[in-house]
């Protein structure tokens, strides 16, 4: 075995053990923990693993000659379970070193230096550890196993740990009592030698230990805490933390516990019963913090000894039936949903509150000492606050998740000729404001919506873009929005959504770009090498298509204010009608906050026809953006000359608005008619647009048919209800398509609710919705209109009755007769005032009277507690059933409707009554609901019945006067 990791034969035989374990009747007899590598957590005493020689803390390197050093614990456990007869393990073992102690006894020290030694492979350990300066004696924590030299036996068979020179400023709770021995009073009895039994391990607060000022690493040369910390960690060491002890900056990530000097973090076997779902205790995000033995109060005077496992996110209540073997008593309590009540400082009791079945329950626990109570309460309160804080933050993180992802996306460097290679720089966020006087660094570019105050200087950029107007050092004008065309060099592309709008709208400042820039934008070159801008350096190509719209989005008002003679020649201008329809171009008077570019830029850009294909042809393939910006194109049938004149003059705009105002009344009248809405084909109310192929090969503007919706004015909704013939959403969608016939489909819920409200909710109109109707046209349509008018005149009274039906009180109990029939039957036995006075004697007399039962049920309905009386009546009917089969079915129905948790008509019963009734259903008799019926009857008698006697409903019956007989 000397071939492993270059060790000699003697060392490899001492460190590596090949163990063959045969399967017993209860498995292989050991448990594992941790990930990469997997370690032995515990070995059952007398089991197959212990007989084969496996020991606790052995690191598993191979399974059946397969390397498993980098496997997870769950994967290795599944592989071990699948082995039918035996397994062959190659393990790495911690070998103790024995040398004489100071008092003549035998002192055993482990040869492993730290937790890093246990986790890292043996051949890499010497390279990863860096020798630091030796620690001072007052900083050392020694850990010895001492034999008494007088009798040659271990004192009680226990290991002893000592702590020398603890820092005075360290905040820790009182430690366990020290053992009184004549030899050395500093030794503390903690852990037994038997690896299968419980180990009590000291866990120190490592963050509070000072370091040498010149050292930056903590290596294995430390003779103090670093050397002995392998026995001071829980066996569930977090994955990936093996290298953290080599760097002081990462030391706070080392898992540790600060809830006391000594805590019981022993590896124990947890047995999960069938009714408890097993947990992933090897999860690196779940750390065992405390393991304490406490008293759990099961009644007022009945207590039981339990072991509380406090993890970083949950609590486990277990009972240790055997040493090192804990049975889980109940489902785990997650810390984010529990509360802690510590009680008085003198009392050793404290409570853990949790929610179960919509009720607040609690566990009453009692510690054995004040120190234990302080330690446990400190741990629970701190981690409950952490978990509740983490549970409140995920929604906020999701809100900014997309923004954070976009900020991390680097800019793609351009590959065009003359573009300089440099690392992508992060741009400021679009909505970020810079204080006055602050200058941007040269490596960063301002985002388009970034607000720069007046007088702020723009530093020179490394690669000036072709459309930059300001020379280095020139101050910006008083406008708050800088020109978005100054953002990126020509060789770079834009990342999605963050700066895709950088050049799509011109700045609303008073200056207008020069004629050369406009000529460059309106006549883009066919290739990057043929033509360059005046401002661009030689050898650098023109900007890609993301910069082409920067000059196309100029408002018309800026062209007229410019004094450049070349601008008066009016090159092919942008038709203003496309911009006026959408109202998207920012004016000079609009504030920057209202004209934000971040959300509207993709849908608000306007491009004249024929410009984008040329720009696309001139775009280099290497600098093509990763996304496609949707373009808005005018239809081919639109007159470009009219659009050009309308875009250059403001009078035509006013005339156009006047025409729209004159047509507004006609449109509003047309909107009120649903029958001919599907025949119209205007794109006025489209919420989104889509591109389509025009008649001459160009792109055309078209409305998405699926987004068309009916829109009515408020006056049309208040008009008289129309007939049932109306077009649904699906009908409108089909009517837009060419060559398709409209078919009926189920309308939208909003339309269904609106039409049912208009027509009174009658069954005739309801049947028309779900059975369909035929498309009417011509003479059939006229006949149907005439017939519907006659039908309306006949059914006015019926419709009004249906509309006012919601104001009538209806009998909502299942199986009851309709409200109208109930009113007629109850009027026949309406009591006199003397009979009503007898109802106040007892609740039984009230329920025995038919009219009294109806009145009391109506009163309970006003208090939203009629389910109590319905349950009582159901139990009375259940007692009258004679057939055993019907009795069983009715009993299950009553339990599911009234008693089961979260039932539709759940009554207010305590848990004992609910469980007692559930047990009675195993053998159904007539009295299985007696206890629950008595509880509900008592509840009505003490609560609802006195309020009924004081209600106006009952007082009116008592004080009623003799009415004259009806005519």
UniProtKB/Swiss-Prot annotation:
Q: Where in the cell is the protein located?
A: Cytoplasm; Membrane; Nucleus
Q: Which Gene3D superfamilies does the protein's record reference?
A: 1.10.196.10, 2.30.42.10, Pleckstrin-homology domain (PH domain)/Phosphotyrosine-binding domain (PTB), Regulator of G-protein Signalling 4, domain 2
UniProt keyword list: Cytoplasm, Membrane, Methylation, Nucleus, Phosphoprotein, Signal transduction inhibitor, Ubl conjugation
Q: Determine the domain of life of the protein's source.
A: Eukaryota
One biological process term from GO is: negative regulation of signal transduction
Residues bearing PTM Phosphoserine: 713, 716, 748, 777
Q: Which CDD domains match?
A: PDZ_RGS3-like, RGS_RGS3
Q: Which residues carry this modification: Omega-N-methylarginine?
A: 167
Entry annotated with the keyword Isomerase = no
State where composition is biased (Acidic residues): 650-676
Q: What is the recorded membrane topology of this protein?
A: Peripheral membrane protein
Does this entry carry the keyword Transcription regulation? no
* Distribution of this protein across tissues and organs: Detected in kidney, uterus, ovary, heart, brain, spleen, lung and testis.
Any idea where the RGS domain is?
A: 842-967
Domain PDZ positions = 18-95
Pfam families per the UniProt record, alphabetical: PDZ (PF00595), RGS (PF00615)
Q: What post-translational modification does the entry describe?
A: Phosphorylated by cyclic GMP-dependent protein kinase.
Composition-biased stretches, type Basic and acidic residues, lie in 677-687, 821-830
Please list where the region (Disordered) is annotated: 115-135, 389-705, 807-830
Q: Subunit structure, per the record?
A: Binds EFNB1 and EFNB2. Binds the GNB1-GNG2 heterodimer. Binds ESR1.
Known role: Down-regulates signaling from heterotrimeric G-proteins by increasing the GTPase activity of the alpha subunits, thereby driving them into their inactive GDP-bound form. Down-regulates G-protein-mediated release of inositol phosphates and activation of MAP kinases.
Q: What is this protein called?
A: Regulator of G-protein signaling 3
Upper lineage: Eukaryota, Metazoa, Chordata, Craniata, Vertebrata
């Amino acid at each position: 075995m000397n071939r492993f990791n270059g060790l000699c034969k003697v060392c490899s035989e001492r460190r590596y053990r090949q163990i063959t374990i045969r399967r017993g009747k209860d498995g292989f007899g050991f448990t594992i923990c941790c990930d990469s590598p997997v370690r032995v957590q515990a070995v059952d005493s007398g089991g197959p693993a212990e007989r084969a020689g496996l020991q606790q803390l052995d690191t598993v390197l191979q399974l059946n000659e397969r390397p498993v050093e980098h496997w997870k614990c769950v994967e290795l456990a599944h592989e071990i379970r699948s082995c039918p007869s035996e397994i062959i393990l190659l393990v790495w073992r911690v070998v103790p070193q024995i040398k004489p102690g100071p008092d003549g006894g035998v002192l055993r020290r482990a040869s492993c230096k730290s937790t890093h030694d246990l986790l890292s492979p043996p051949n890499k350990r010497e390279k990863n550890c860096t020798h630091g300066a030796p620690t001072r004696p007052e900083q050392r924590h020694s850990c010895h196993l001492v034999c008494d030299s007088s009798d040659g036996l271990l004192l009680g068979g226990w290991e002893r740990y000592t702590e020398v020179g603890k820092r005075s400023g360290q905040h820790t709770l009182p430690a366990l009592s020290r053992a009184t021995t004549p030899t050395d009073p500093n030794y503390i009895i903690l852990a037994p030698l038997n690896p299968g039994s419980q180990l009590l391990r000291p866990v120190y607060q490592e963050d509070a230990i000072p370091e040498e000022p010149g050292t930056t690493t903590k290596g294995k040369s430390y003779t103090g805490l670093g050397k002995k910390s392998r026995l001071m960690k829980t066996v569930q060491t977090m994955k990936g933390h093996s290298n953290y002890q080599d760097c002081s900056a990462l030391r706070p990530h080392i898992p540790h516990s600060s809830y006391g000097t000594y805590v019981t973090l022993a590896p124990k076997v947890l047995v999960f019963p069938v009714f408890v779902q097993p947990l992933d205790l090897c999860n690196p995000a779940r750390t065992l913090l405390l393991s304490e033995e406490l008293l759990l109060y099961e009644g007022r005077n009945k207590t039981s000894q339990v072991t509380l496992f406090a993890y970083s996110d949950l609590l486990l209540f277990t009972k240790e039936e055997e040493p090192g073997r804990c049975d889980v008593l109940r489902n785990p309590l997650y810390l984010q949903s529990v509360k802690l009540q510590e009680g008085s400082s003198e009392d050793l009791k404290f409570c853990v509150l949790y929610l179960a079945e919509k009720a607040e329950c609690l566990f009453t626990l009692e510690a054995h000492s004040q120190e234990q109570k302080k330690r446990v309460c400190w741990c629970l309160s701190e981690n409950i606050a952490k978990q509740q804080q983490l549970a409140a933050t995920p929604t906020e993180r999701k809100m900014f998740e997309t923004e954070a992802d976009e900020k991390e996306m680097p800019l793609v460097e351009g590959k065009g000729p003359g573009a300089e290679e440099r690392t992508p720089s992060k741009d400021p966020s679009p909505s970020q404001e810079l204080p006055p006087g602050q200058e941007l660094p040269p490596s960063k570019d301002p985002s388009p919506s970034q607000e720069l105050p007046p007088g702020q200087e723009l530093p020179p950029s490394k690669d000036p873009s072709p459309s930059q107007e300001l020379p280095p050092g020139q101050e910006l004008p008083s406008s708050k929005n800088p020109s978005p065309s100054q953002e990126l060099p020509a060789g770079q592309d834009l990342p999605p959504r963050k700066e895709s709008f950088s050049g799509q709208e011109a700045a609303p400042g008073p200056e207008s770009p020069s004629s050369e820039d406009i000529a460059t934008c309106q006549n883009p070159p066919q290739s990057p090498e043929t033509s360059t801008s005046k401002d661009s350096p030689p050898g650098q190509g023109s900007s890609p298509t993301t910069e082409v719209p920067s000059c196309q989005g100029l408002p018309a008002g800026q062209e007229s204010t410019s004094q450049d003679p070349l601008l008066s020649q009016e090159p092919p201008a942008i038709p203003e009608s496309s911009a006026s329809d959408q109202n998207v171009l920012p004016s000079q008077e609009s504030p920057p906050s209202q004209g934000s570019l971040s959300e509207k830029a993709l849908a608000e850009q306007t491009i004249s026809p024929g410009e984008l294909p040329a720009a696309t042809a001139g775009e280099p393939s290497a600098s093509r953006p990763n996304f496609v910006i949707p373009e808005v194109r005018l239809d081919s049938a639109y007159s470009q000359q009219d659009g050009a004149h309308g875009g250059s003059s403001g009078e035509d705009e006013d005339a156009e608005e006047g025409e729209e105002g004159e047509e507004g009344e006609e449109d509003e009248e047309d909107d009120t008619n649903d029958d001919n809405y599907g025949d119209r084909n205007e794109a006025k109310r489209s919420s989104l647009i889509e591109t389509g192929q025009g008649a001459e090969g160009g792109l055309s503007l078209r409305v998405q048919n699926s987004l068309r919706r009916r829109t009515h004015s408020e006056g049309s909704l208040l008009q008289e209800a129309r007939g049932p013939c109306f077009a649904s959403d699906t009908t409108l969608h089909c009517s837009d398509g060419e060559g398709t016939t409209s078919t009926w489909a189920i309308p939208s819920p909003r339309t269904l609710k609106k039409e049912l409200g208009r027509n009174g909710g009658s069954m005739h109109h309801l049947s028309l919705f779900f059975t369909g109707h035929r498309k009417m046209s011509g003479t059939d349509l006229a006949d149907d209109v005439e017939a519907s008018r006659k039908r309306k005149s006949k059914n006015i009274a019926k419709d009004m009755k249906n509309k006012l039906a919601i104001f009538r009180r209806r009998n909502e109990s299942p199986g009851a007769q309709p409200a109208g029939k109930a009113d007629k039957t109850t009027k026949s036995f309406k009591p006199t005032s003397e009979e009503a006075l007898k109802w106040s004697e007892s609740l039984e007399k009230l329920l025995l009277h038919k009219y009294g039962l109806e009145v009391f049920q109506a009163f309970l309905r006003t208090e939203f507690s009629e389910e109590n009386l319905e349950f009582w009546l159901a139990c009375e009917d259940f007692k009258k059933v004679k057939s055993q089969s019907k009795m069983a079915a009715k009993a299950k129905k009553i339990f599911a409707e009234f008693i089961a948790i979260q039932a539709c008509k759940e009554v207010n019963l305590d848990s004992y009554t609910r469980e007692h009734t559930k047990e009675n259903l195993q053998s159904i008799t007539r009295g299985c609901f007696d206890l629950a019926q008595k509880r509900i009857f008592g509840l009505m008698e003490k609560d609802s019945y006195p309020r009924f006697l004081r209600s106006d409903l009952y007082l009116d019956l008592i004080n009623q006067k003799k009415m004259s007989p009806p005519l």
